[in-house]
Amino acid sequence: MTKKIVTLSGDGIGPEIMAAGLGVLDKVASKIEFDYDVDAKPFGGAGIDAEGHPLPKATLEAAKSADAILLAAIGGPKYDNAPVRPEQGLLAIRKELNLFANIRPVRIFDALKHLSPLKPERIEGVDFVVVRELTGGIYFGEHILEEDKARDINDYSADEIRRIMRRAFKIAQGRGKKVTSIDKQNVLATSKLWRKVADEVSLEFPDVTLEHQLVDSAAMITNPARFDVVVTENLFGDILSDESSVLPGTLGVMPSASHSENGPSLYEPIHGSAPDIAGQGIANPISMILSVAMMLRESFNETEGAELIENAVDKTLNQGILTRDLGGQASTAEMTAAIISNL
């Protein structure tokens, strides 16, 4: 059955890295007999330029009917003071598709260990996933600003916590069978509920070990290798996922996914649109290419295709083929061609 993939190239280097990702997908699809159609739609700044809105109606309708969505990058300085900004499109599509779970793998590539700000012995064996709840918590509560005081309401329901916990435990079942739930249970009421629900969900997954960890002693920098799957609420997840992105020493090799309960998932690099290098052909496409691998595995259960891509990226880096952000001289096209060759 042919799968429908909606692509949102967006802004800056987005079109360049999207082309790289689709080039790799085309090659690997022929190897694993994966049939798909691509429906390219404007989004972000490109949506504003084309339709006056970062999430045009036709783009949203296509996304809702897709089997998966690939997003490259959005934003740029031309929109900094605009009344409508590209980032509003990302918030809107998350809401419209009910993307409640953000998944961010953190892995250290052997060929890039020297880029990490941590000592080699600290990053040895680092391979974990941060699972962040996206639709609840303090970001979506009431925000009240008065003249000399302010308050932000942090709300979570047991159902919101339960579904993100189940997602984390299911991911752990396919990995190291360990979940670390991060909260602030010694202070926050929401964290007390978070921990209670986590304990309840853990009973559904007897093959997975659950540990609780307070957010202020998570030790993600001092002992990152201890983690397998980390699950946490929106605010803590925002901070910890960004903190974890420091470990590899570059944003250029980190993919991510955002999942709904029943609809399509969205896959994207964690880096920005890099408008300063857009159009120069020097952008690093690896995050986008690894996002394609995540899509194959998580939306289509095409584990073989995902592993082919990941192994090809590993091999390419080990051959010393590096883009400028990684300390080399390879262009976007050269890096992409090398990865395709190594498939």
Residue ranges and their predicted role:
Residues 45-48, 107, 114, 221-321:
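Glycine-rich phosphate/nucleotide-binding loop
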Residues 21, 25, 198, 288-299, ...:
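Buried hydrophobic packing segments
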Residues 33-57:
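N-terminal beta-loop-helix "entrance" segment that forms/cooperates
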Residues 1-4, 34, 64-68, 98-99, ...:
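Short coil/turn connectors at secondary-structure junctions
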Residues 11-14, 67, 131, 168, ...:
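Buried hydrophobic positions in well-ordered alpha/beta secondary-structure cores of metabolic enzymes
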Residues 49-154, 235:
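N-terminal glycine-rich phosphate/adenylate-binding segment common to multiple enzyme folds
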Residues 6-23, 28-29, 147-218, 226:
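Glycine-rich phosphate/diphosphate-binding loop of Rossmann-like nucleotide-binding domains
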Residues 135-181, 185-187, 205, 304, ...:
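Glycine-rich phosphate/pyrophosphate-binding loop and the adjoining helix
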